[in-house]
Amino acid sequence: MPFSRTLLALSLGMALLQNPAFAAPPLSMTDGVAQVNTQDSNAWVEINKAAFEHNIRTLQTALAGKSQICAVLKADAYGHGIGLLMPSVIAMGVPCVGVASNEEARVVRESGFKGQLIRVRTAALSELEAALPYNMEELVGNLDFAVKASLIAEDHGRPLVVHLGLNSSGMSRNGVDMTTAQGRRDAVAITKVPNLEVRAIMTHFAVEDAADVRAGLKAFNQQAQWLMNVAQLDRSKITLHAANSFATLEVPESHLDMVRPGGALFGDTVPSHTEYKRVMQFKSHVASVNSYPKGNTVGYGRTYTLGRDSRLANITVGYSDGYRRAFTNKGIVLINGHRVPVVGKVSMNTLMVDVTDAPDVKSGDEVVLFGHQGKAEITQAEIEDINGALLADLYTVWGNSNPKILKDQ
C-alpha cells in the first residue's frame, strides 16, 4: 500500500503544531494529596485509597491468577486521580495499566510503573509518535492506520507493539470487521506490516448483558483463532483479551488471558456485586441558611414555589462543578445525616436545599452530594435515575472539575 513519507511528515507536523501532545489538561502526580484544605474549596471529591486497594485485592482473589489484570485508568482514573492511585497500583502488583491519553501515560511512567502500558483507544498519529518514549502499546484496527504507524516506527528505529482490535461484538469503533472478506484480508495484512509487533488480539463488548457478551465472545474466539492460524501467529506469544468490568464479574469464560476492569476498580458495578466498595464521594458546604415565607419562588425561572414558611440552605456547588441541572427539584443531598431536597433550578455555582425539617443545619456544615454520611447514603441508583445516564457520566466530571483529596479510609 503506497504512502508518501513527505505527506505523512507534513500531516504529523501540522497536527503537532495545532494540537498539544496531550489529549487532556496536564495532570499532577500529587494533585489533591491530603494537604488540600476543604475550607478553601467550594466542592471537592474524596478518594478512598483503602477501598480502591480492597477492590483490586477482591478482583485478584476472584481471578485466582488464571488471568492477569489490566487496570483501566483512562479519563484520569475515571476522575479519581491517576497520580493519586498509581502508588496503590504498583504496591498491589498490578502488571498492566490501560490509559487513553499521552498525559495519562506520562503520569503512569513518572509514578515509577515499569509494567505493561496499553492505550485502550485508537490514537491519532501525532499522539502515537509523541507517546513513543512511554513504551505504550497501541490499539490497531485499521490497515491504513497500521501502515502509517509502521512508517513512524521505522523513522524512530524501533518496533511498535500493537494490539489488533476485532469488531467481534459489534461495537463498530476500533476493530476490524471479520465478517467480510475484505476485513479478514485486512486483519491478516496488519499482522504482516513491518515494524509492528502484534502481541495481542482484543475486542470490546457493546452491551452489559450476559447473553450478548457470550455471543460476542464466541465470535471473538472463532475469529481470533482463524486469524492466528492463517497469519501463523504463535499462540503462546499472543494475549487474548476482551472482558470489561461487567464481563469480568458476570461472564467468567470471558476472562481469557487478561481482563480490563475499569468501573469495578472504583466500586461501580452491577448491584449484585456488593463486595466492591465505592471509592469516590462528592462533597460541598452550606454557605448560609435563610428563612423565606410561604408563596416565595426559588431560583431562576421560578420553577419551585414554597408551600410553607421554609428554611433554605445555600450550597456552594452548581452545574459548573458537575452537579447537573437534571437535579433541579429532584436531587437529594445529605447534611448532618438528613436527606434534604434540592429546590429550584441548579445554578452555575449554587444550589438551594430545603432544610425546614432539619433545624440543626447551619453555615459551614458539610454536604454530601454523592456517598455516605453516617447511616444515610445518596446511592448510585437514585443518581442514575434522576440524571438518566450512567454514573460514570457524572463522576468523571466531578473528579476532573473539583479538587481531589486522598483518604486512607
From Swiss-Prot:
Disulfide topology: 70-96
Annotated signal peptide: 1-23
Entry-linked CDD domains: PLPDE_III_AR2 (cd06826)
SMART domains, A to Z: Ala_racemase_C
Needed cofactors: pyridoxal 5'-phosphate
Temperature dependence: Optimum temperature is 65 degrees Celsius.
Residue positions, PTM N6-(pyridoxal phosphate)lysine: 74
Family annotation (Gene3D superfamilies): Alanine racemase, Lyase, Ornithine Decarboxylase, Chain A, domain 1
Primary site of residence: periplasm
Binding site for substrate: 173, 348
Cross-referenced Pfam families: Ala_racemase_C (PF00842), Ala_racemase_N (PF01168)
Name of this protein: Broad specificity amino-acid racemase
Originating species: Pseudomonas taetrolens
Lineage start: Bacteria, Pseudomonadati, Pseudomonadota, Gammaproteobacteria, Pseudomonadales
